[in-house]
Design a protein with these regions (language model features):
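Phosphate-group recognition and catalysis centered on beta-loop-alpha active-site segments
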Residues: 18-248
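Sec-dependent N-terminal signal peptides
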Residues: 5-14
């Protein structure tokens, strides 16, 4: 118990003097996969081939979710309860998309980990080469260390960062978020950070000039379009996932 108390005191002491004026922002990144200030909106959660073809008639890119299975296949699913006999593979998904190499893809790799990082990387590289999409695909994961293996192979990587609510003043939870993210990025270089749009203030305060990819879950009404249009004005924000039927 004593050891735990000492650790908490030390951490708290180190954090209490921090604010956005005396904390250096992390400034990166020279490589940007997509940078079109007039067309930042991509379609969120497009896990069916028919929907992909329909949305790619108006959207320049789509986001999809994949799980890597021990049978050396990626399955396109948002939930880990998928049935391999009823769920399309990433190979089938890409095979069914019209002019597949003409579009952009944000691949949310749900279960990337130390156990599957080597084999899943080989499989991803194979699919990217086969369909000619390596230069227009983002691979995203919460696992910054395993994702680094993908970055080392010149795959564009986005580190998914969870952040507690932030109103411009750093709470203890925010300080812990900041410390963790900074430490992870110092260990493993990535091309972008991805998070919910609610976290934009935190990201722009402490990760200046970093490429940002945002999703906007919950913003679906007509009035919410103004909020999303405001997100477009940030130069660091490169991609915004939306749940509307058409870009605007």
């Amino acid at each position: 118990m004593l050891k735990k108390i000492i650790v908490i005191v030390v951490v708290t002491f180190g954090f209490t003097s921090c604010n956005k004026d005396d904390l250096d922002s992390i400034q990166l990144f020279e490589k940007t996969l997509y940078d079109n200030s007039e067309n930042k909106l991509w379609k969120h959660r497009v896990n069916e081939i028919d929907n992909a073809n329909r949305y790619l008639e108006s959207f320049i890119g789509v986001e999809l979710d994949v799980f890597y299975n021990t049978n050396d296949r990626f399955y396109v699913s948002h939930d880990d309860t998928y049935d391999i006999n009823q769920t399309i593979t990433f190979n089938e998904y890409l095979s069914g998309i019209n002019n597949v190499s003409d579009h952009y893809y944000w691949v949310d790799f749900k279960n990337l980990n130390e156990t599957n990082e080597v084999n899943s990387l080989k499989k991803m590289l194979h699919l990217m080469d086969r369909f000619g999409i390596k230069k227009n695909t983002i691979v995203e994961s919460t696992n910054h260390t395993s994702l680094k293996k993908f970055n080392d192979e010149d795959i564009y990587t986005s580190y998914w960062v969870p952040i507690h609510s932030y109103n411009g003043v750093l709470s203890m939870e925010n300080l812990q978020d900041l410390e963790e993210i900074r430490q992870n990025l110092s260990e493993c270089e990535h091309n972008a950070l991805s998070s919910h749009s609610n976290n934009l203030l935190f990201l722009t305060d402490y990760f200046k000039d970093y490429n940002l990819h945002l999703w906007t879950n919950g913003l679906i009404g007509q009035d919410d379009k103004e909020t999303i249009n405001n997100l477009k004005t940030y130069s660091d924000v490169k991609v915004i996932l939306i749940d509307y039927e058409e870009p605007f």
